[in-house]
Amino acid sequence: VDLKTNLKEDHYLQAMLGSIVIKTQQKEYRPVDIVADVLTRRDTTHAVLNCGDFHLRMDTHGGYKKLLSRLDELQGEVMSQLKNRRIDQVAIRREFPLGRITLTTGKDNFISRFIEYNGYHFKTVDMDLRTSPISGLNGHLNIDSLVAQGVQLDTVRANVMTQGDTIRYTARIVNNKKNPQYVFQALVDGELAERGSDIAARIYDANGKLGVRVGL
């Protein structure tokens, strides 16, 4: 562990944890080394966490105190709007911190195994999200071979983008012909609106025929 601080705004931590053994009633886990690299100053916050094929990175403008304050203000704004049942996307966007968070992971790491222990399985996850009080929320989330509560989804692709004053999103869920449960393709398009969210969904069967079309 390497720790440096001025006991004010500047803190730096670099650490490696190894030789860890975690026991549950069913299995014993011996995760590979966990490496953490965290830096925060008045003008920036940077964090990296690596463990096997798990790689998480976060970079934001401003120190950790400013980041926590912005997140608290964002939460307060969202909760207030939900209570009033009226969404003001511009007001929400003003509270976004300026930052980016990326995640790539497979199954060969302690965190994925812990998630699996809790009943969720996946092959790979790839996420890239960017927030800004000017450009809003933009990014993607890709998941391959997701199993949740006994339901297997072969491919999940989701995107979020801010266009003008509106946050829009798309999603595609595909189960190929080798899926043992259901073969289908679902497409979702939507955007946040003042009174909630406008959603359009289409579901195609194994032959590519449109089976369900829903607009809310």
Model regions and ranges:
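Interface amphipathic segments
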Residues: 1-216
